[in-house]
């Protein structure tokens, strides 16, 4: 388990590596010895002493330059074990061979660690030569995952021939790994809470910038009058096809001919022809199937009652289960009425409102108009037809006594009484019959008398002689 101090200040490790010079091998030779002062951050006991570290002038005299060093000036490593309850326990410390430690100077190098200290890290305050007390701090942390079976500087793996700076390098490397993991864990925790953590470039402190900002939509439609913006180039490319009406994917089904902008829409459309509905609602008692996953997702909101699409217009507050419904609703607030009635010219904001208007008014009006035409349609010789043609009624044959001539037989007194009668020509009780088949288009009446038949045009009939001369009255012998 990493300590709270490590999680809050993991940047100390990075600063130490950047600002501290550590030899990489025994071939490194420095002409002068440098004082490395120990700045104590831990409680100092009476038995604690510090000694000066002398970097040797020549790497070949390591075996001959060893001097006796007090036992309190040795470098110790901390062995940490994780107990069964998840808490860290301090194990025994292992003493390192003081091969390169010198007692010729009184400057302190390292500080003894208290065996009773229960923290899980070691603070070794090392400074570069000339920096003094302004040196950066180093936090040495041993990775928990490597504690078991691979303790750093354990008594079994300790070798007096290994230089101390290699061990410090290894310890610093492990500490950097642990600190990086701690920082990543902290970033993941803050990201889950909706916060974005940035590391400052100047002071190295982490700062919370608040909620995550929305993704910037950089792709804007260049078509005049269109202000749509997009994040993904694929969506932007699809939108441009709508302006060009580029429907390059055509349905191959016979008699369909529908076209689409993208291939995926065509594939979904083909399911309407083959009847495929691969997406099923698994709610109890439902079992409805859909052609697309989006339709199934919208359908499930019926069961859950979820309406995630909220109208942001002031004072509205309506919410919808589908985004398409929200877009249709927004037209109401914009005042646009793009849907027009083809009969009366009235405009509507929604196509559904226009369709309701058509069914309510114009369909009833059309039915009423046809019914009125049927009711006002008079018989073939009706007076309204004659008045419309501006023909005097006294010169024509009138049949007002019969509502219809469709297939009915009319009894006439005699054949000579058809013409020249002012009011009514057709009278009941005649032994002779007239079979009339009305022709609404030509307004003709066929009359029979014995073996002879006559066709009379009622619009031009004046007298029998004129009818014969003009061809309005014809005689057929059968």
Swiss-Prot record:
GO terms for cellular component: chromosome; nucleus. Induction: During fibroblast senescence. Zn(2+) 1 binds at residues 221, 226, 239, 243. The keyword Protease does not apply. Zn(2+) 5 binds at residues 341, 344, 357, 361. It is found in: Nucleus; Chromosome. Transcription factor that binds to the sequence motif 5'-CATCCCATAATA-3', and is specifically required to silence expression of fetal hemoglobin in adult erythroid cells. Prevents expression of fetal hemoglobin genes HBG1 and HBG2 through CHD4: acts as a direct transcriptional activator of CHD4, a central component of the NuRD complex that represses transcription of fetal hemoglobin genes HBG1 and HBG2 in erythroid cells. May also activate transcription of matrix-remodeling genes such as MMP1 during fibroblast senescence. This is Zinc finger protein 410. The gene is ZNF410.
């Amino acid at each position: 388990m990493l300590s709270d101090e490590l999680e809050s200040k993991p940047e100390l490790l990075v600063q130490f590596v950047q600002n501290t010079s550590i030899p990489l091998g025994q071939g490194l030779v420095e002409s002068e010895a440098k004082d490395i002062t120990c700045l104590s951050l831990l409680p100092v006991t009476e038995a604690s002493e510090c000694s000066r570290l002398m970097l040797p002038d020549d790497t070949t005299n390591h075996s001959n330059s060893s001097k006796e060093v007090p036992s309190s000036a040795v470098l110790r490593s901390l062995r940490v074990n994780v107990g069964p309850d998840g808490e860290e326990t301090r194990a025994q410390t292992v003493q390192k061979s003081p091969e390169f430690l010198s007692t010729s100077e009184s400057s302190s190098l390292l500080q003894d660690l208290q065996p009773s200290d229960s923290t899980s890290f070691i603070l070794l305050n090392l400074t570069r030569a000339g920096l003094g007390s302004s040196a950066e701090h180093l936090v040495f942390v041993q990775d928990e995952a490597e504690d078991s079976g691979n303790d750093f500087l354990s008594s079994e793996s300790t070798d007096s021939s290994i230089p101390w700076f290699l061990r410090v390098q290894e310890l610093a490397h492990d500490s950097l790994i642990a600190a990086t993991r701690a920082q990543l864990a902290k970033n993941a925790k803050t990201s889950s809470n909706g916060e974005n953590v940035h590391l400052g470039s100047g002071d190295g402190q982490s700062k919370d910038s608040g909620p995550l900002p929305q993704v910037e939509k950089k792709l804007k439609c260049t078509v005049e009058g269109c202000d749509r913006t997009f994040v993904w180039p694929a969506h932007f490319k699809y939108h441009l096809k709508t302006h060009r009406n580029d429907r390059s994917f055509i349905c191959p089904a016979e008699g369909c001919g529908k076209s689409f902008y993208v291939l995926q829409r065509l594939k979904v459309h083909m399911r309407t022809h083959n009847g495929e509905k691969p997406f099923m609602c698994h709610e109890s008692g439902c079992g409805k199937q859909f052609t697309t996953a989006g339709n199934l997702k919208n359908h499930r909101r019926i069961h859950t009652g979820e309406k995630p699409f909220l109208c942001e217009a002031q004072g509205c507050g309506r919410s919808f289960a589908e985004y398409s419904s929200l877009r249709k609703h927004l037209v109401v607030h914009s005042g646009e009425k793009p849907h027009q009635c083809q009969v009366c010219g009235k405009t509507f904001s929604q196509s559904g409102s226009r369709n309701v208007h058509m069914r309510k008014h114009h369909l009833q009006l059309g039915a009423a108009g046809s019914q009125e035409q049927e009711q006002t349609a008079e018989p073939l010789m009706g007076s309204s037809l004659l008045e419309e043609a501006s023909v005097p009624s006294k010169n024509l044959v009138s049949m007002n006594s019969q509502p219809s001539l469709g297939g009915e037989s009319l009894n006439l007194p005699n054949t000579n009484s058809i013409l020249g009668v002012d009011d009514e020509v057709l009278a009941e009780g005649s032994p002779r019959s007239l079979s009339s088949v009305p022709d609404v288009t030509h307004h003709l009446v066929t009359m029979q008398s014995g073996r002879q038949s006559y066709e009379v045009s009622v619009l031009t009939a004046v007298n029998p002689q004129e009818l014969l001369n003009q061809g309005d009255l014809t005689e057929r012998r059968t």
